[in-house]
UniProtKB/Swiss-Prot annotation:
It comes from Drosophila pseudoobscura pseudoobscura (Fruit fly). Residues 44-57, 79-91, 117-126 have a biased composition (Low complexity). Keywords: Cell membrane, Glycoprotein, Membrane, Phosphoprotein, Sugar transport, Transmembrane, Transmembrane helix, Transport. This is Facilitated trehalose transporter Tret1. GO terms for biological process: trehalose transport. It comes from the Eukaryota. One of its GO terms (cellular component) is plasma membrane.
Length: 868
């Protein structure tokens, strides 16, 4: 028998009492002993078949401070032995020190036994009373020296067997355990009378250690029941990791269900821990896709297999479900993983104070002085939204100097292409005058043939606009532009050397096809190469050079016949061709084709050799990944969806009223119109004046469009065109009916100047501008291609039928028809066209469609591929 049992036996001197007396006083003494000496009461509602259950799972908080021996199992006492055992229990109750119990908590590991104490564990015999009460005496607390030695031994992790503890845990399933707090149990009576200071300090330490067991009994009981409900507590501890970040890791439930074995579960959990960093800050990590791609060696070989992808669904996240290729996130070694994790932490630090930046600054494509200063001062953060909830996309601040000369060279090269386009478009206006003169040509050009010479170019432009989309996608922006230079030269030479109308028509068709391709590829190249800080200034160059080309054609046509004018047109693409060889392909196209190194070289050329292009390159890669995820196979079916039809219809309506205002008919036939009007001013001089007005009006519109608003300028443009067209119609009506209009020779020129000025202020640039503003981002590229093709179709109809309309209804009828269409267009603008001045793209789309999508950048606009 242990020393504890000897003390109990020596302390009880009551002798043998009758059985009835002992049984009668059992309950009273048990209650008094528990109240006076601080016992904890443990009740059990176990069934009779489980009466051998012990309470060994209720352990002391520290196995050294409260040493206990392995539980001893005894069957139920036979009736003839109960009297003697009850007497012994009564003697022990009077002499034993108070008890203390602690339940098995969640942090305890039953497979990792407590450390062996410095002294031999004492044997303990559980005290039983009426088969439902078990009490264990509490030994005296250790001294400070013993505690220090014990903690040193714990660090060496010397295990002891705990097989009985495991069996006891299993036996407590379904049991009900309650605790009663009694602070008196914290101090044994034998130790309370000591006056020695060291003994008092030891007792105080022991009291503090025991006190922890009485904290929040309800919570302890709840945790105890939760632990007892698990067959494998180690597995419970492993699965507990998934609750560390419930919002970001709820998707792991599906992975845990798929685990058929514990080994598979641990493997899945290790993979999850390696990727768990992505859920730390969902506002940023959805943009950090493929952060660990560099540490994977299998991703390139296995490709984008859908079986290796998982859908991360965050119910309370601000992002849409995001597809991440898990193989791109795998890491071959811990070193690679830690390197990637450090990179992630550096990027994540940008959003640590997002609450103070709920209204970050956004710089639109044209830019402004205030936005430029802000971007130089603080990190440029663009706020974009998805389904009405804010989301942040982080860009680095522009700290590198802007190398203007390289970007000016790129913009100048592209703008020379616009000059060629403007010259080709205006060619028929001065050329048809000399071409229809039998004294200046070797072949006859009938009025019907002349209408085809002017109208075939827009028809070919329609075909070129459709073909330009796949060309810039697969050949590249720069290569596509280069491919148009040689056909421009060939087309002009065909016209210059023509011996019949067929050669002229062939040259015009080839030139029109190149115009359609260039009208789509030139602005795309410029938008993808120029920095936002100078995009507003350099973005004006193509429009200005296009008007210069028109003016040059009008001026040269005054002194040259149609053949010499065509030779001049053949010479213009030569400098354009040479300069295009000096500039690189756009970095964004290289990224879209997976050529990262070439994209880096192109950025270095455009931004400067000493510029840090890595942040911008990574931003391009993230934008391309976004565009690829949003891309759909059938673009045309997407256009026909109900939510997309309204903005597309408005864009097509603006294009329709732009061309049906008769602008191209006026430009193409300016000289003929002034000649028929009998103006006292030379027709060629009038044409030059119209070209100058068109050139100057472009700069006026640039100053007013962001101040007066889109709709105001459209109103002014419509009213100006309506008045001038009806006045011109009245002038030609009076002239055709024999009235004397010689005193009004100045009127046609005045009307043409006002008409061109009004058109250039509103219906000239605004339909193209609003096409990029009101079209939804998801269909912006394909819808823009459709709108461009529709614009060229209307141009062809107007230019081809203008001469027929004059022959059928007279010049006055044609101008009145155009004026009536402009009048209808005024009501179209009032009723259907929204005002977009000062509004973000998200606000515009919310108004148009009733919801918000994340706005893609201009470079994400993909041309229509016509995947029917």
């Amino acid at each position: 028998m242990s020393g504890r049992d000897n003390r109990g036996a020596g302390g009880g001197g009551g002798g043998h009492q009758p059985l009835s007396s002992a049984m009668g006083k059992l309950k009273e003494k048990l209650t008094r002993a528990g109240d006076d000496q601080g016992y904890h009461r443990v009740e059990s509602n176990l069934s009779t078949s489980n009466t051998a259950t012990s309470l060994d799972t209720i352990l002391p908080e520290d196995p050294f401070l409260f040493p206990q021996a392995a539980p001893q199992r005894h069957p139920l006492p036979r009736p003839q032995q109960q009297q003697q055992q009850q007497r012994q229990q009564l003697r022990l109750l009077e002499d034993e020190p108070p008890l203390s119990f602690r339940p098995l908590l969640e942090d305890d590991d039953i497979n990792e036994p407590p450390t062996q104490p410095f002294q031999q564990q004492q044997q303990r015999t559980p005290l039983r009373a009426s088969g439902s009460l078990e009490l264990t005496p509490l030994p005296p607390p250790p001294t400070s020296q013993e505690i220090r030695e014990h903690r040193d031994r714990q660090q060496r992790s010397v295990p002891v067997p705990v097989e009985d503890l495991q069996r006891s845990k299993q036996s407590l399933k379904g049991s009900r355990v309650s605790f009663e707090k009694n602070n008196a149990s914290s101090k044994p009576p034998a130790q309370a009378e000591s006056s020695d200071e060291d003994s008092f300090e030891d007792k105080r330490i022991g009291f503090q250690q025991q006190k922890a067991t009485s904290v929040d009994h309800k919570g302890i009981l709840k945790d105890l029941k939760h632990i007892l409900a698990n067959d494998n507590r180690r597995q419970f501890q492993a699965k507990k990791h998934v609750s560390l970040d419930v919002k970001g890791t709820r998707f792991l439930q599906d992975l845990l269900k798929e685990s058929s074995s514990e080994e598979e579960f641990h493997k899945t959990r290790r993979e999850f821990q390696g990727r768990k960093h992505q859920s730390l800050d969902p506002r940023v990590t959805f943009k950090l896709d493929k952060v660990l791609q560099g540490s994977s060696t299998d991703s390139d070989e296995e490709g984008d297999d859908p079986e290796h992808k998982r859908l991360i669904h965050r119910p309370k996240d601000i992002t849409k479900p995001l597809i991440i290729d898990l193989k791109d996130l795998e890491s071959e070694s811990d070193e690679d993983f830690h390197t990637s994790r450090q990179h992630f932490q550096q990027q994540r630090s940008i959003s640590t104070d997002s609450r103070k930046s709920r209204r970050p600054y956004e710089m639109d494509e044209m830019g402004n002085k205030r936005g430029e200063n802000i971007r130089h001062a603080v990190p440029f953060v663009r706020q974009i939204t998805e389904d009405g909830k804010p989301k942040l996309e982080v860009y680095r601040p522009t700290t590198n100097p802007i190398y203007i000369w390289t970007q000016v060279l790129a913009a100048l090269s592209v703008s020379l292409g616009s000059l060629v386009v403007g010259f080709v478009s205006a060619y028929t206006s001065p050329a048809l005058v000399s071409m229809t003169n039998r004294n200046m040509t070797s072949f006859e050009v009938t009025p019907q043939a002349a209408s085809w010479v002017g109208g075939i170019m827009p028809l070919a432009g329609l075909a070129g606009g459709i073909a330009g989309g796949p060309f810039i996608e697969y050949l590249g922006r720069r290569n596509t532009i280069l491919a148009t230079a040689i056909p421009f030269i060939v087309s002009s030479l065909l016209i210059a050397c023509a011996v019949n109308v067929a050669m002229v028509l062939a040259g015009r068709f080839l030139a029109g096809f190149c115009v359609g391709i260039a009208s789509l590829s030139l602005p795309v190249y410029l938008g993808e190469t120029v920095q936002p800080e100078v995009r507003g200034t350099l973005g004006l160059l193509p429009t200005a050079f296009g008007n210069i080309g028109i003016l040059l054609c009008f001026v040269a046509g005054t002194y040259m016949d149609w053949s010499m004018l065509a030779f001049l047109g053949a010479a213009l693409p030569v400098p354009f061709l040479i300069l295009m060889f000096l500039i690189p392909e756009t970095p964004r196209w290289f990224v879209s084709r997976g050529r990262e190194e070439k994209a880096r070289k192109a950025l270095s050329w455009l931004r400067g050799k000493e510029a840090d292009v890595e942040p911008e390159l990574k931003g391009l890669m993230r934008s391309q990944a976004d565009a690829d995820r949003q891309a759909t196979q059938n673009k045309m079916m997407e256009l026909l969806k109900r939510n997309n039809l309204k903005p597309l219809s408005i864009s097509l309506g603006l294009m329709f009223f732009q061309q049906l205002s008769g602008i191209n008919a006026v430009i193409f036939y300016t000289v003929s119109i002034f000649k028929d009007a009998g103006s006292t001013i030379d027709g060629n001089l009038c044409t030059i004046i119209v070209g100058i007005v068109n050139f100057m009006a472009t700069f006026i519109a640039t100053l007013l469009i962001d101040r007066a608003g889109r709709k105001i300028l459209l109103y002014v443009s419509n009213i100006a065109m309506i008045i001038t067209l009806f006045v011109l119609g009245g002038f030609f009506y009076c002239k055709s009916h024999g009235q004397d209009v010689s005193q009004l020779g100045w009127l046609p020129l005045s009307c043409f100047v006002i008409y061109i000025l009004g058109f250039s202020l509103g219906f000239g640039p605004i339909p193209w501008l609003m096409m990029g503003e009101i079209l939804p981002s998801k269909i912006r590229g394909s819808a823009a291609s459709v709108a461009t093709a529709f614009n060229w179709s209307c141009t062809f109809v107007v230019t081809k039928t203008f001469q027929d309309m004059i022959d059928f209804m007279g010049a006055h009828g044609a101008f009145w028809l155009f004026g009536s269409i402009c009048f209808i267009g005024l009501f179209f603008v009032i009723l259907y066209v929204p005002e977009t001045q000062g509004k973000t793209l998200e606000d515009i789309e919310r108004k148009m469609m009733g919801r918000v999508r994340r706005m893609s950048s201009v470079a994400n606009m993909k041309p229509l591929a016509f995947n029917m």
